[in-house]
Amino acid sequence: MSNKYLVEGSTSELTTKTAAELAGLIHSREVTSREVTQAHLDRINEVDGEIHAFLHVGEEAALAAADAVDKALDAGEAPASALAGVPLALKDALVTTDAPTTAASKILEGYMSPYDATVTRKLREAGIPILGKTNMDEFAMGSSTENSAYGATRNPWDLERTPGGSGGGSSAALASGEAPLAIGTDTGGSIRQPAALTNTVGVKPTYGTVSRYGLIACASSLDQVGPTARTVLDTALLHEVIAGHDMFDATSVDKPVAPVVAAAREGANGDLKGVRVGVVNQFDREGYQDGVLEAFHASVEQMRSQGAEIVEVDCPHFDDALGAYYLILPCEVSSNLARFDGMRYGLRSGDDGTRSADEVMALTRAEGFGPEVKRRIILGTYALSVGYYDAYYLQAQRVRTLIAQDFTRAFEQVDVLVSPTTPSTAFKLGDKITDPLEMYNFDLCTLPLNLAGLSGMSLPSGLASDTGLPTGLQIMAPAFQDDRLYRVGAAFEAGRK
């Protein structure tokens, strides 16, 4: 199977180039940022009716930003960043002053933020035109982008299948040539999992290294904003733009940004000599799709052939990660989403003068939230209630500590860990949406990193032999050493060419 949208289906070669290539053309004035941005806007108009990657397209604002870059470059000014002039798709969980921010929920339909998220501001300052806001599972709760109040996104590799979630819109935009760069958020795999299903690259940075200010929260101790693109280098270039300490984010860490771009360039030589790669036993076993395991084993052997030392690693508490995650996350959701009550912003239902404030709040939340969001609010409220807090929430937090300790011990033995990103390739739309447990199981490989606050990357690892659909290799690194992801990821990417 091939992705007809990215290669054969493109009407402009500008939409098939990497972000680094586009930046080189723009900065050398061989092409303008307006031409590149317009090509991608045309591409969105051409194919997004089928893909539905975008919830909002800001053509006027994107072209104005592109014109500003062109004007500065024509005046002899240095580019504002390595990606100045290259357009980008932004997940609709990050607030913007010039476009609606809905988090794909009816309760925020039409909401206009009075301020930009820190990541949004950094993108603007870097001269990166924002093409629009991408579709997602409502409030980032889901693994297929089917939970969006505005319709599902489709996978460019097979329109009957999911692009993953919660950030399927961003990855589908990349895979269909609608954008060369995108921003996602990752609570339990929402960047990495869609990247695996769409043959793109996605990174969850170390918790606290990219600002969450202006991110509509799902679970505050798990959420992390991150970059996604079609190559490791492009992802590194975007990572460097958005990372850094932010005084407006209480969870932001005041540490130097890891040298991710330098690491990606270093790894491009394909040499993995001296790198110890740990294969996590808990993620290499029966129950995963045969084609996914075959691709994973082939990836491990490729890394061995590139000089890496392969070490089997045991992380016993990973088996309990799914249960712990789906207790901690709903508890944080029930707290975070209490603010959406119809009183201050967003939807307000039944406010006809005959109902009390409590009745208006109840009706607003009943009409404004979708089924999965309601399910998690109820679960979280129950787990936090008197008599159950110690038995459920505190126990889950203890398991979280044990998982972090497993990672610490593992990284004493190896430089990075690897696993499949997902247990299977993309499933058909509708297959899991009525079975929450099946949907939750799709996050098995990715969510332990979020519980521990560490960094991870998914990058293409070949097509599955049984479905012909993309698979992803997940690389995991210690906290604040995100550059290891890029060094190893770029080398692996080079070895596949």
UniProtKB/Swiss-Prot annotation:
Coiled coil: none
GO MF: ATP binding; glutaminyl-tRNA synthase (glutamine-hydrolyzing) activity
Pfam family, one: Amidase
Reactions accelerated catalytically: L-glutamyl-tRNA(Gln) + L-glutamine + ATP + H2O = L-glutaminyl-tRNA(Gln) + L-glutamate + ADP + phosphate + H(+)
InterPro entries, sorted: Amidase, Amidase_CS, Amidase_dom, AS_sf, GatA
Class of this enzyme: ligase
Record bears the keyword Ligase: yes
Entry EC no(s): 6.3.5.7
UniProt-annotated catalytic positions: K91 (charge relay system), S166 (charge relay system), S190 (acyl-ester intermediate)
Listed GO CC annotations: glutamyl-tRNA(Gln) amidotransferase complex
Keywords: ATP-binding, Ligase, Nucleotide-binding, Protein biosynthesis
Annotated spans, Disordered: 150-173
Biological processes annotated in GO: translation
The keyword Iron belongs to this UniProt entry's keyword annotation: no
Top-level taxon of origin: Bacteria
Function: Allows the formation of correctly charged Gln-tRNA(Gln) through the transamidation of misacylated Glu-tRNA(Gln) in organisms which lack glutaminyl-tRNA synthetase. The reaction takes place in the presence of glutamine and ATP through an activated gamma-phospho-Glu-tRNA(Gln).
Subunit field text: Heterotrimer of A, B and C subunits.
PANTHER family assigned to the protein according to its UniProt record, in alphabetical order: GLUTAMYL-TRNA(GLN) AMIDOTRANSFERASE SUBUNIT A, TRANSAMIDASE
Family: Belongs to the amidase family. GatA subfamily.
Protein name (database record): Glutamyl-tRNA(Gln) amidotransferase subunit A
Organism of provenance: Corynebacterium efficiens (strain DSM 44549 / YS-314 / AJ 12310 / JCM 11189 / NBRC 100395)
Lineage: Bacteria, Bacillati, Actinomycetota, Actinomycetes, Mycobacteriales
